[in-house]
């Protein structure tokens, strides 16, 4: 008997795996990452941790790039970011 809602447990869809808890995925992986943040004033690029717990300021112009929340850091409006590669 085959049910309509059967899911292949060895090859789950990527969107289902991304929503699962980091320890309950088929292959464990963290939710955090490093990113390059570009300052809106001087266009200087700074590497920032996605879940940083301190305020991050630009090295050149002392502009605040991101502020901690409770989980992911909140980027300042106007700042652009790019996720760092592996």
Swiss-Prot record:
The keyword Acyltransferase does not apply. GO terms for biological process: translation. InterPro entries: Ribosomal_eS27, Ribosomal_eS27_Zn-bd_dom_sf, Ribosomal_zn-bd. A zinc finger (C4-type) spans 39-61. Keywords: Metal-binding, Ribonucleoprotein, Ribosomal protein, Zinc, Zinc-finger. It holds the Pfam family Ribosomal_S27e. GO terms for molecular function: mRNA binding; structural constituent of ribosome; zinc ion binding. PANTHER family: 40S RIBOSOMAL PROTEIN S27 (PTHR11594). May be involved in the elimination of damaged mRNA after UV irradiation. Belongs to the eukaryotic ribosomal protein eS27 family. HAMAP family: Ribosomal_eS27. This is Small ribosomal subunit protein eS27y.
């Amino acid at each position: 008997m085959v049910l309509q809602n059967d899911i292949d447990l060895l090859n789950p869809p990527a969107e289902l795996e991304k929503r699962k808890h980091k320890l309950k995925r088929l292959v464990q992986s963290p939710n955090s990452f490093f990113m390059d943040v570009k300052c809106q004033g001087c266009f200087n690029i700074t590497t920032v941790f996605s879940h940083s717990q301190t305020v991050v300021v630009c090295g050149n112009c002392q502009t605040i790039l991101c502020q901690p929340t409770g989980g992911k850091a909140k980027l300042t409006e106007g700042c652009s970011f790019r996720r760092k590669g592996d």
